[in-house]
Structure formats: C-alpha cells, structure tokens
C-alpha cells in the first residue's frame, strides 16, 4: 500500500524531549496528530510506531518511545 498515514498520539504530561538534530522540543500534555508517508508497507510502519522498544530511526520515534506517550489510533490512506 502506498500513501499517507495518521497517528493520534496522547502525551500524558508536559514533556521536554531531545529529538535528534532538532534539539530539545517541548510537548504540552494533550493530543497530537502525526502525518507520515510511505511508498509501501504502511501497515507495518504503523505497527512499528506503536511499539515502545525499537531502534530510533525517525524523529517521531523519539516521541513514541517515551513512556508518557501513547499511540491512540492510526489510519492509512
């Protein structure tokens, strides 16, 4: 499958996370939507984003591996 996907994330408390070359980024408690794209295997990409333990490969991984962040829902288009 080729296209875009959306992740609905819940940040459980205010956080400051170092995100690769972006440096420290502040996230307020609440809901966020991440928009990603892929040439194929979107369902596998979504499943990977839902895992807490993984090699940090993309900027979103710095957020999704945090214990105070949950992927609530995901959709691929």
Predicted regions, residues:
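Conserved helicase motor core of SF1/SF2 NTP-dependent helicases
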Residues: 1-2
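Short secondary-structure capping micro-motifs at structural edges
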Residues: 19-24, 60-61
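GIY-YIG nuclease signature motif recognition
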Residues: 33-38
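Aromatic/basic micro-patches that form nucleic-acid/chromatin recognition or nuclease catalytic surfaces
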Residues: 12, 39-77
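A short beta-strand micro-motif
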Residues: 5-10
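Non-catalytic terminal regions with compositionally biased, polar/charged low complexity
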Residues: 28-29
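Short N-terminal binding/cap micro-motifs at the start of the first secondary-structure element
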Residues: 14-18
């Amino acid at each position: 499958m080729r296209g875009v996907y959306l992740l609905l994330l819940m940040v459980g408390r205010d956080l400051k996370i170092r995100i690769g070359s972006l440096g420290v980024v502040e996230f307020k408690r609440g809901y966020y939507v991440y928009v990603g794209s892929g040439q194929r295997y979107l369902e596998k990409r979504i499943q990977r984003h839902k895992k807490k333990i993984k090699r940090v490969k993309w900027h979103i991984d710095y957020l999704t591996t945090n214990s105070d962040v949950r992927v609530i829902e995901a959709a691929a288009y």
